[in-house]
Each structure stands twice: as C-alpha cells, then as structure tokens.
C-alpha cells in the first residue's frame, strides 16, 4: 500500500478510536500519569498469563521451548522475590496448533515435567482446538480436550482468595452466546465473595473494541457480559497482537489485557493491509502479582531474550474503582509523546548475502517505544523504495533496527526515516545520504 495512503488510513483510524473511546476518556480522565509501584508492595499471589502457544507435537519446536521456559523462568524470578510463590499459569486458548492428540500430548508433557507443586495451570479452549474437526464435527474438539486436559471446559477457581474464571468457546469452536448465562452466574458469585478485589477472567478472543487487535479478533458477547463488572481484569489472545504495545491494556467499564503469543507477536498498521509478523523472533507472556488489598502489578516478559521489558509494567491500584482509569485508551494516548531518535543517531548501510541493501539505525523512543517507521529512499526526486515497517519493540533486548530495502542500482540516494508512536504521533525524521557502489 502506498505510504501516503497509509498515513491517511492511520489518521482516520486514530480519529475513529478517539471518538469511540471519548466517553471513557472523559470518565477516567486524561493527562494522568500512571502510579509508580509502591516500595512496600508485597504480593500474596503471583501468576503467569500466556496464549497462542500453537504446539505441533514436536519437542524441538521453538514454541514448546518457550512454554517450558515460562515455568522455569518464572520459578527463577519468584525465587529472587520476598514472596516466592508461583501460584498459577493461565493459558488463554490455542495451546495446540489444531487440537490434534499429539499436540495435547506435548502440552501435557511440558506441564507434567515443569509445573511444580503449588502451581495450578488454568486453561480454556481457543479456536485452534477445533480446527482439525470442523469439516465434519467440531464437537470432537471438546472430547479430545476432555481426554487430555479436563472434563470441565469452563472453570471457576479460587487461589489465595482471588477468583479466576475461564471460558471456552461453545462446542462449535466459534461462539460464546451459549456461555453468557454461566459466565454471569460465576461472576455474580465472585463479586458476592470479593466485591472490592479484582476478578480474573480469561477467554481466547478479545472483548470487542477494547485492546489492540479487538477490532477484528474479538467477541461481542464476552464484551457485553463483562461490561457490568468493574472488578474484572480480562486476559485474551487470538490476535497475537503485540502485548508490549500500550494499546494492549485498556480500562473502560472493566480492565482488558491482551496476551500476545508464545508463537510470534503480530501487528497491523492500518487494518486494511492485513496482519504482519513483527521482525525477528518474538514471544511474550505476563507475570501478574497481586497484594492483599487487591492492587495489581503486570510485568511483561520477553520469552525470546528471557528478560523483562524495561518499560512495559502496569501498576493498577483499586481495580474495582470505576473512577480510576489510568490505563484507558484516552489517557494513555494523552500522555504519549512523539518518538525521537537519539541526538547522535546515524544511518549505516550494509549489504546482505543476496546483495540487497540493509539500513541500520537506532530505535526511537518517546513516552512509549516507536511502533513503526515510515521509510523513503530517493534517487534525486524519484522515490525508489518506500514502506512503513513495524519496529522491533516486540523485543526487550534489541536497540537497533535493520531494514532490508532490496537491491538498489549504483548511485547516490537520500534516506528519510520517520518514527511513529503506537498512537500515531510522529517524531522528527532521521535523514541520511548513501552511496551504492
């Protein structure tokens, strides 16, 4: 898609979301800095959250290794903390590639070999748990799940005084309408027990029009049900959209959190060109900690580089308080700033093994990391290459971009690289001249 048309589309989408979330922005307030984590924050509950593992039944699959590392890395982290518990793992669907038995065997094997005493693994079914059977009988997906995981496809569990409610797709593998009454009943029980504490809900698709990816990878029945419960902190996957992106958390009438993927994080720059994989290997999961008063801390962990993201951490006090919305779409957009390159930033040029030109330049950062770069390569007045590329903000360990612009003829070129934030705020462009000999 033409880079200029993309800019128009991005502006339209940003305006549409601003209008849609306008009411929530006014209710929750804007220009409010999220609170820092108190020094005396002491968890009484710790759990990890992932989705979209997509196991294929092979132990050397990268996704299988990452799911294994989720357990081991979280145990290692917990051992360094004052509260050493690792109480639960949530898998918000798509643990398998197609719901096939060998994939479940691998899933169960990883849990059996790595999940220690005191840690519960809570699971719900995603659409991929039905894929193998849809052409003749999707209900077989339930039978296979029950054989390997649990007789209960929907669960309500209490851990350390906190409620966890998991909801699977109906046996068609597509809808939730038949699950609404059950979900309401379980939410009412949880609210009656702990009205001022967070209630953790998880299902595979995003609630419609909440987090990043919920325009086109979502379910409306889930959204309308949860809207009545401000205590809810909902975890969802399905889109694979980058959980490191600030749009992957949103507080409206409840709190929504996108879980990304243990397979590959994805992005969508304009909702027209389609979903794109983020550059390189990417995968992430959340580690959540809750104190005795119900204050919640979310920390994002890079499952590829095995480290936390430095700046992707959300402290949410008073989750059930309707007036406290530090992480609304409107507030986060209001505190966002245009990303800027470092003052001494330069573009270097290299050639890969195929003879194609690669541009190397440092990451740009504002309040949030740059989400994309709009790059133009010109020979004189003629544009010979232009595109919008997703940044490497899906990795906690990378500080530099490498962008392949293809084979260029010998000559002199001008490169312009403009950074943009997740909320489409543009920073000062980096320009450079280069010679292809």
Can you say where each PLM-predicted feature lies in the sequence?
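N-terminal active-site segment of His-dependent metallophosphoesterases
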Residues: 24-102
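Extended active-site neighborhood of metal-dependent phosphoesterases/phosphodiesterases
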Residues: 100-188, 193-194, 218-228, 244-279, ...
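Short acidic, glycine-rich surface-loop motifs adjacent to enzyme active sites
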Residues: 190-212
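Binuclear metal-dependent phosphoesterase catalytic core
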Residues: 247-343
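Conserved aromatic anchor
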Residues: 355-368
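Beta-strand-rich modules
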Residues: 405-425
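Extracellular fibronectin type III
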Residues: 422-437
